[in-house]
Curated annotation (Swiss-Prot):
Part of the 50S ribosomal subunit. The gene is rplM. Pfam families: Ribosomal_L13. This is Large ribosomal subunit protein uL13. This protein is one of the early assembly proteins of the 50S ribosomal subunit, although it is not seen to bind rRNA by itself. It is important during the early stages of 50S assembly. The keyword Ribosomal protein applies. It comes from the Bacteria.
């Protein structure tokens, strides 16, 4: 039997909607990255974009285990002398743009390169319950039910 290599015209893309409420951030990011890359499909081909579209809602209710909300920090530099800035994961989650927390976690779980950048564009993250993608008839994926460790109660 020969090795199958998918062609871009043969790829059937689905839409998934994932509710992030109470789900552990890292476990959620792994599942999203696999869906975006198409690793859940039998026709997965490393050099072809076989991934699906993923819509994540309730990004502000994602769960961080341990003391990561207070202790883990994102750093950036303004470019000016002494311009190092930082923000904790809890501040980002509770701030104006909680979707950036999930976006950054998924981005760091994908390979770096032009194909991964194209796959990453199929991720849409929303802080609240509403999303404008009902016309695509997305399939609801219950990440919390896949594994008991995916969801934390407190």
């Amino acid at each position: 039997m020969k090795t199958y290599s998918a062609k871009p015209s043969e790829v059937d893309r689905k839409w998934y909607v994932i509710d992030a409420e109470g789900v552990v951030l890292g476990r959620l990011a792994v599942i999203i990255a696999d869906l975006l890359r198409g690793k859940n499909k039998t026709i997965y081909t490393p050099h072809i974009d076989t991934g699906d579209h993923v819509v994540v809602i309730n990004a502000e209710k994602v769960h961080l285990t341990g003391n990561k909300a207070a202790n883990e920090r994102f750093f950036w530099h303004t470019g000016h002398p002494g311009g190092i800035k930082s923000r904790s994961l809890g501040q980002i989650r509770d701030g104006a743009h909680p979707e950036r927390l999930i976006e950054k976690a998924v981005e760091r779980m994908m390979p770096r390169g032009p194909l991964a950048r194209a796959q990453f564009k199929k991720l849409r993250v929303y802080g609240g319950e509403a999303h404008p993608h009902d016309a695509q008839q997305p399939v609801v994926l219950d990440v919390a039910a896949l594994n008991p460790k995916n969801k934390r109660s407190a």
